[in-house]
């Protein structure tokens, strides 16, 4: 009976097929010319339910970004809360066609088993900068709570470059110096993807076409690095979670140079790939980066009604 009910729920919640560049939503959009398909979970598979009564639930909260903004740290720290069940991996359901085409039934199988009172959370930082994702998430759940962690756009660019650089080095592949990617004919290379990902104003406009600002909580990633506890408290309040995480759950690791977690007497830190040192960059190039982001940052501050301590 539970599985039959689940099939009915998924029929209602099945995401709609949308174009890569969706039009603004209007009256009757959800009813006009949409292809739906029934998702049935066979009774003999046990998919979506466990013998202990826990089930796999579609997420009620998604960490949508930003890449190299601190999404993994946010998820790990939020997972300290007993009422949170987090998906371990980046699911890439709403931005990868090979996943999205498989429907909500597939998406559900990527979620952790959880108790009815728990909040299921997944994080895929690429969602924030993907034009098609906001409408797709809205089609699944228009009242979903979204988390967005942002840091200084210039610092985020350097972190973005550093990650790709290390990925190439691990595969023994060459990768150009950051100056070669950032500069072209004496000017900033605005076609460099890492720059585009830091234009928060442009991406946020797309999300606000489908969700009110009150449904998107912005975590200050720079403050989160310096002192995570106050930012986590704000997230708890936004998600209407009881205050269970406390300052004793965090300690500063001098060797690593960032905060680690303490849970039930056990200490653990993020993967060694987190918190890598950035390459040395010419101060003049940094000045160009700061100047490039100055006006977009002002527009973003006005859009969201708050300011951040960015260059």
From Swiss-Prot:
Question: According to its record, what are the GO cellular component terms?
Answer: Golgi apparatus; Golgi lumen
Going by the record, the broad EC class of this enzyme is transferase
Q: State the Gene Ontology BP annotations.
A: glycosaminoglycan biosynthetic process; heparan sulfate proteoglycan biosynthetic process
Record Gene3D superfamilies: P-loop containing nucleotide triphosphate hydrolases (3.40.50.300)
Q: Which Pfam families match?
A: Sulfotransfer_1
- Any keyword Transferase? yes
**Gene Ontology MF terms:** [heparan sulfate]-glucosamine 3-sulfotransferase activity
EC id? 2.8.2.23
Where along the chain is 3'-phosphoadenylyl sulfate bound? 68-72, 151, 159, 259, 274-278
Cell compartments where the protein resides: Golgi apparatus lumen
The function of this protein is: Sulfotransferase that utilizes 3'-phospho-5'-adenylyl sulfate (PAPS) to catalyze the transfer of a sulfo group to position 3 of glucosamine residues in heparan. Catalyzes the rate limiting step in the biosynthesis of heparan sulfate (HSact). This modification is a crucial step in the biosynthesis of anticoagulant heparan sulfate as it completes the structure of the antithrombin pentasaccharide binding site.
The record ties this protein, via PANTHER family, to: HEPARAN SULFATE GLUCOSAMINE 3-O-SULFOTRANSFERASE 1, HEPARAN SULFATE SULFOTRANSFERASE
Under which name does UniProt file this protein?
Heparan sulfate glucosamine 3-O-sulfotransferase 1
Taxonomic source organism: Rattus norvegicus (Rat)
């Amino acid at each position: 009976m539970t599985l039959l009910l689940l099939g009915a729920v998924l029929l209602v919640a099945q995401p709609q097929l949308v174009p890569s560049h969706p039009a603004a939503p209007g009256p009757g959009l959800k009813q006009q010319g949409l292809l739906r398909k029934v998702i049935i979970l066979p009774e003999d598979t046990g998919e979506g339910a466990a013998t202990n009564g826990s089930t796999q639930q579609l997420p009620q909260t998604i960490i949508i970004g930003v890449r190299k903004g601190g999404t993994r740290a946010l998820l790990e720290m939020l997972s300290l809360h007993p009422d949170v069940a987090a998906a371990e991996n980046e699911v890439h359901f709403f931005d990868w066609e090979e996943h999205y085409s498989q429907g909500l039934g597939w998406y559900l199988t990527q979620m952790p088993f959880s108790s009815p009172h728990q909040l299921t959370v997944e994080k895929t930082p690429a969602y924030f900068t993907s034009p098609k994702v906001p409408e797709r998430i809205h089609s699944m759940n228009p009242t979903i709570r979204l988390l967005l962690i942002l840091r200084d756009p210039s610092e985020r660019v350097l972190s973005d470059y550093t990650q790709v650089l290390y990925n190439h080095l691990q595969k023994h592949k060459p990768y150009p110096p950051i100056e070669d990617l950032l500069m072209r004919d004496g000017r900033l290379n605005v076609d460099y993807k890492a720059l585009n990902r830091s234009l928060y104003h442009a991406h946020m406009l797309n999300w606000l076409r489908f969700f009110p600002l009150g449904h998107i909580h912005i975590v200050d990633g720079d403050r989160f690095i310096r002192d995570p506890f106050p930012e986590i408290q704000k997230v708890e309040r936004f998600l209407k979670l009881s205050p269970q995480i406390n300052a004793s759950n965090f300690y500063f690791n001098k060797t690593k140079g960032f905060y680690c977690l303490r849970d039930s007497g056990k200490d653990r830190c993020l993967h060694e790939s987190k918190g890598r040192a950035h390459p040395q960059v010419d101060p003049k190039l940094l000045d160009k980066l700061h100047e490039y982001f100055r006006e977009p940052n002002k527009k973003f501050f006005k859009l969201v009604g708050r300011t951040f301590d960015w260059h």
